[in-house]
Amino acid sequence: MSAKNLIRAAAFLMFACAVLHSFAWTRAFADFSPEVRQLAALLWFLLGIDWAVVAGLWVMGASQGVAARRLLLFSAVVPIAVAVGLILTIGPLFFPIYLQLGAAGLLLLGTFRLA
């Protein structure tokens, strides 16, 4: 698989994370107390948008190739930080951790293979 296609696959996986996250929107209301429900809903919404934007930036970075290498590498911080946060708060058995790490891994592999 070419480097650009690996980056596009990472973007697809990150966008899938955003879609799955937005489908679970109503769960945010059930899992939190009424005092913090508004804040939880806002954070839930912002994470979905964040991941969709990152996926879009990765697609644009793949089309630019080597010129976007530094920015692509820097943007890998987003899914890695999310995965680490989920491991620390929920535990390592939570499936979305591996979606985030998979997206970051594909991105890093594709970015390092850019010629």
Q: Across the structure, where does each feature detected by a protein language model lie?
A:
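Positively charged n-region of N-terminal signal peptides that target proteins for export
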Residues: 1-4, 113-115
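Interfacial segments of alpha-helical transmembrane regions
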Residues: 2-14, 71-72
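Core segments of alpha-helical transmembrane spans in multipass integral membrane proteins
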Residues: 12-25, 38-62, 74-79
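C-terminal ends of transmembrane alpha-helices
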Residues: 19-30, 84-92
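Short juxtamembrane and helix-loop transition motifs at transmembrane-helix boundaries
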Residues: 31-39, 55-68, 83-88
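Non-cytosolic membrane-interface motifs at loop->transmembrane helix junctions
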Residues: 34-41, 93-103
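Membrane-helix boundary connector in multi-pass membrane proteins
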Residues: 63-98, 110-115
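Small-residue-rich segments of transmembrane alpha-helices in multi-pass membrane proteins
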Residues: 103-110
